[in-house]
């Protein structure tokens, strides 16, 4: 496994602890005497005005539209690198996690739709349980240390990247608002400029960021979700260059700490604060949170494992080296940790759906993701060989 992937796995696993702390802090504040201050902080208006450009949004939307665009820029860089030289660079390597990712998105979406098909507003949340939070999933896996085979970590990483790619497509197709043709035209022009820069071998990251900023503003104003600008810029950064060995890897390395230790924890803090006041068992079992909980905890492992098993049995794909189906099943449960990615989709799905839909969806995400983390950890602990014990025995 390359040094880049090793560093990535180590960093993302460590950030999971900070994510948990950020989410817990948000929950504590939302259910304490500081709830009003917490909400007021998120509602703080932040205005940026440059000549005719005027962007005035609450802090919450700056986090969701701005900071998360940087996160999706990183996702774009990761997907491109893996497709060119990593775990997704060959058909044999990519087939198994790709098929698993498709199953892991379809089954949760169908389960959610089953419980919410009659509610027009709730139906918009069908993609919420389809996402996987790679930081949390790798963080849980890291608790088992060297017992986890490298090939199993790479499988989870590749699956999560495919999952992210699916989320990007879903956002583009299903969560786009009424379009502004003028802003969209500027966005297309900025994209073509980035493509031209890539084709002519431009490798100065600063120029890509400058055009990328124009693209982000245009996409923000167009009605398409602004995070897609980050993905586009990520795909346009060249893997190799004349001045720099790899502009893509250089930018990826620079963004990882900011994403792991600031952007995702800040997003978790801003979106995980669910007030539990007046929420009882009946609320927890209402269609929206129930569909999300079952989608994450039941649908994810059902979809990932079943379609993976069928693909191997039918000869369409093959298991990674040194990995068995028990371990794949355990990892498929960990894929039900939706958390930040699920909350991001929920913020888009219920942006205009009312307070209850937003709160109930976050509640379902928290419960479903927690169950997936606990059960997934226990299942993986049972499925993995006790390598450390074996090594200590050999030394006697």
From Swiss-Prot:
Lineage, opening ranks: Bacteria, Pseudomonadati, Pseudomonadota, Gammaproteobacteria, Aeromonadales
Localization in the cell: Cell inner membrane
Membrane topology according to the record: Multi-pass membrane protein
GO cellular component, one term: plasma membrane
Pfam families: Na_H_antiport_1
Reactions the enzyme catalyzes: Na(+)(in) + 2 H(+)(out) = Na(+)(out) + 2 H(+)(in)
Similarity comment text for this entry: Belongs to the NhaA Na(+)/H(+) (TC 2.A.33) antiporter family.
UniProt keyword terms in alphabetical order: Antiport, Cell inner membrane, Cell membrane, Ion transport, Membrane, Sodium, Sodium transport, Transmembrane, Transmembrane helix, Transport
Transmembrane segments: 16-36, 59-79, 95-115, 124-144, 154-174, 178-198, 213-233, 254-274, 278-298, 328-348, 363-383
InterPro entries with a match to the protein in the record: Na/H_antiporter_dom_sf, NhaA
One of the GO BP terms on file: regulation of pH
Superkingdom classification of source: Bacteria
Transport keyword on record: yes
Major place of residence: membrane
Name of this chain's protein: Na(+)/H(+) antiporter NhaA
Species: Aeromonas hydrophila subsp. hydrophila (strain ATCC 7966 / DSM 30187 / BCRC 13018 / CCUG 14551 / JCM 1027 / KCTC 2358 / NCIMB 9240 / NCTC 8049)
GO MF assignments: sodium:proton antiporter activity
Function: Na(+)/H(+) antiporter that extrudes sodium in exchange for external protons.
PANTHER family attached to this UniProt entry: NA(+)_H(+) ANTIPORTER NHAA, SODIUM ION/PROTON ANTIPORTER NHAA-RELATED
NCBIfam families: NhaA (TIGR00773), PRK09560.1 (NF007111), PRK09561.1 (NF007112)
């Amino acid at each position: 496994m390359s040094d880049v992937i090793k560093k990535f796995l180590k960093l993302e696993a460590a950030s999971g602890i900070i994510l948990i702390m950020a989410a817990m802090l948000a929950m504590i504040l939302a259910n304490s005497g500081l709830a009003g201050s917490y909400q007021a902080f998120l509602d703080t208006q932040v205005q940026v005005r440059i000549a005719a450009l005027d962007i005035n949004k609450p802090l919450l939307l700056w986090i969701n539209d701005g900071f998360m665009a940087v996160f999706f820029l990183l996702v774009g860089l990761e997907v491109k690198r893996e497709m060119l030289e990593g775990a997704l660079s060959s058909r044999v390597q990519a087939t198994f996690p790709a098929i698993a990712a498709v199953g892991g998105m379809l089954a949760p979406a169908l389960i959610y739709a089953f419980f919410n098909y009659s509610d027009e507003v709730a139906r918009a949340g069908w993609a919420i349980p389809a996402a996987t939070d790679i930081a949390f999933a790798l963080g849980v896996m890291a608790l088992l240390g060297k017992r986890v085979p490298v090939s199993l970590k790479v499988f989870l990483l590749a699956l999560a990247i495919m999952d992210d790619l699916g989320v990007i497509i879903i956002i583009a197709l299903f969560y786009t608002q009424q379009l502004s043709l003028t802003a969209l035209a500027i966005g297309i022009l900025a994209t073509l400029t980035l493509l031209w820069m890539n084709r002519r071998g431009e490798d100065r990251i600063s120029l890509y960021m400058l055009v990328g900023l124009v693209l982000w503003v245009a996409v923000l104003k167009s009605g398409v979700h602004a995070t897609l600008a980050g993905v586009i810029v990520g795909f346009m950064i060249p893997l190799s260059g004349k001045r720099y060995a790899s502009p893509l890897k250089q930018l990826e390395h620079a963004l990882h700490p900011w994403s792991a230790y600031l952007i995702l924890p800040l997003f978790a803090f801003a979106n995980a604060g669910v007030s539990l006041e007046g929420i009882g068992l009946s609320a927890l079992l209402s269609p929206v949170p129930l569909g999300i909980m079952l989608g994450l905890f039941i649908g994810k492992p059902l979809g990932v494992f079943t379609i993976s098993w069928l693909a191997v049995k039918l000869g369409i794909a093959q298991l990674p080296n040194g990995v068995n189906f028990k371990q794949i099943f355990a990892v498929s449960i960990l894929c039900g940790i939706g958390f930040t990615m699920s909350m991001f989709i929920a913020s888009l799905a219920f942006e205009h759906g009312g307070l209850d839909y937003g709160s109930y969806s976050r509640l379902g995400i928290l419960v479903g993701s927690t169950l997936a983390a606990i059960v997934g950890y226990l299942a993986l602990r049972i499925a993995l060989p006790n390598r450390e014990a074996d090594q200590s025995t050999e030394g006697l």
